[in-house]
From Swiss-Prot:
Database matches in HAMAP family: MTTase_RimO
UniProt protein name: Ribosomal protein uS12 methylthiotransferase RimO
Domain MTTase N-terminal: 33-143
Domain spans labelled TRAM: 401-467
Cofactor(s) the record lists: [4Fe-4S] cluster
Location, primary (coarse class): cytoplasm
GO CC annotation terms, alphabetical: cytosol
Length: 472
């Protein structure tokens, strides 16, 4: 959707990993050592799940979609906001009731006491990106099977829980910022960037396997390499600078769509826009702004010069007219007055952002923001949320209407009896809109087609294929 709020959901269930592995490895040898897996939360957590599942398969374990058939269940949790914590605890409860042997990992795992208080019978608890610890615990309770690793047929890219034509590429862990509404640094630690060579190796394998779109994710993507102290890495026999602009430039040469998510508004974001104008990476900028009132931004410990942000948006659009800007905002932050909220609405009117997500402030356990000002009532938060949504829906409809009559590349995600469903450069999977191509039932997921946009609303586009020559 173009304008959305947080709706907690399981990213993957017991069923998804099993089907993914079955499709990738139909000739795998049955070992009898079966693991169930539930993954919750954001794309960064999904990447962690993929890594754990890959190593489990390398070690010879099967992944099952049945609690009854599993020797043990792993639940990879989310702990970002209270709704996510509740969902994670519910998933652990279900796994305990249906199976009884459960290992908990992920962000909520960093709060072991909180989990033990509710579910004292879980076998083991680890924090986020504790891959080795998770596998060690699995080996303890379900002995590593004897098997020939060459019969597992694990793809070179590892296990992926996304469709074959797109994949998330995580470039770092942790975050050095200390936003008062966020507890991620306490869960995942400070910034820890992956070596550039390792990232580019993974990206190359993904593209060679048929991935058409690489979605770059981390807690703070634009900070990539700040912790490297200016040191270069090597890839393909050549030195590579370890900063987000250099990394994006290299990724853009690989022949796939490259989409950047979670860009903190640092000054050097300006350097990414020419790469978008040149077509090296998608002209799509996911840049969470959170608010527009200088007073609230200061309380959030976020950049507070809204005038500079508006100037930057204008400058970016002059350099790259096709630029699509996605952002997220929080309404009902502690101490937010009606005047503060009106400043936010005025900012939306002037900025004319393309894609916007809205969150009603949630009291995250351990967040500094809970104690810095008077909490806003649920009634006021709900009212401001709906006013925000109503305004942004009008803006989104206006921004999408500019595509009508244009011919765009559309990446097909799904095909049903009514036609094909895809996305343009303006649409990230799951969070943005879709492009509906009615009647085109012969297309297949992963195809890239040229289509003329015929209609739009505040969320989605409709199109007709104009070029029968497709690429897959």
């Amino acid at each position: 959707m173009t304008v959305e709020t947080f709706k907690p959901k399981q990213t993957t269930t017991l069923d998804t990993p099993a089907k993914t592995l079955e499709a990738a490895s139909t000739n795998a040898v049955t070992t009898g050592n079966r693991i169930g897996f539930v993954s919750l939360g954001c794309p960064k957590n999904l990447v962690d799940s993929e890594r754990i599942l890959t190593q489990l398969r390398i070690d010879g374990y099967e992944v099952t979609n049945s609690y009854d058939n599993a020797d043990l269940v792993i639940v990879n949790t989310c702990g970002f906001i209270d709704a996510a914590v509740e969902e994670s605890l519910d998933a652990v409860r279900e796994a305990l009731e249906e199976n009884g042997k459960v290992i908990v990992t992920g962000c909520l795992g960093a709060k072991e006491n909180q989990i033990r208080e509710v579910h004292p019978d879980v076998l083991e608890i680890t924090g986020p990106h504790s891959y080795e610890a998770v596998l060690k615990h699995v080996h303890k309770y379900v002995p590593k099977p004897e098997h020939n690793p060459f019969t597992s047929l694990i793809p070179q890219t590892g296990v992926k829980l996304t469709p074959k034509h797109y994949a998330y590429l995580k470039i770092s862990e942790g975050c050095d910022n200390r936003c008062t509404f966020c507890i991620i640094p306490s869960l995942r630690g400070d910034l820890d960037s992956r070596p550039a060579g390792s990232i580019l190796d993974e990206a190359k394998r993904l593209v060679e396997s048929g991935v058409q779109e690489i979605l770059v994710v981390s807690q703070d993507t634009s900070a990539y390499g700040k912790d490297k102290g200016g040191r270069t890495d090597f890839w393909d026999g050549m030195p590579v600078k370890q900063d987000i602009t250099s990394l994006a430039r290299q990724l853009g040469k690989m022949g796939a769509w490259v989409r950047l998510h979670y860009i903190y508004p640092y000054p050097w974001v300006d350097d990414l826009i020419p790469l978008m104008a040149e077509g090296l990476i998608l002209p799509y900028l996911d840049i969470p702004m959170q608010h527009a009132s200088p007073r609230i931004l200061k309380m959030m410990k976020r950049p507070g010069r809204v005038d500079r942000q508006l100037e930057a948006i204008q400058r970016w659009r002059e350099i790259c007219p096709d630029l699509v800007i996605r952002s997220t905002f929080i309404v009902g932050f502690p101490g937010e007055t009606e005047e503060d909220f009106q400043i936010l609405l005025d900012f939306l009117k002037e900025a004319r952002l393309d894609r916007v997500g809205c969150f009603k402030y949630s009291e995250v356990d351990g967040a500094v923001a809970n104690t810095i000002a008077e909490l806003i009532s649920e009634e006021v938060k709900e009212d401001r949320y709906h006013r925000f949504m109503e305004l942004q829906a009008e803006i989104s409809a206006e921004r999408l209407a500019r595509f009508v009559g244009r011919t765009l590349d559309i990446l097909i995600d799904d095909v049903d009896e009514e036609g094909a469903i895809g996305r343009s450069f303006a649409d990230a999977p799951e969070i943005d809109g879709m492009v509906f191509i009615n009647g085109e039932t012969e297309l297949e997921p992963g195809m890239l087609v040229r289509a003329r946009i015929t209609h739009s609303d505040e969320h989605d586009l409709w199109a007709e294929v104009v070029d029968a020559d497709t690429q897959d």
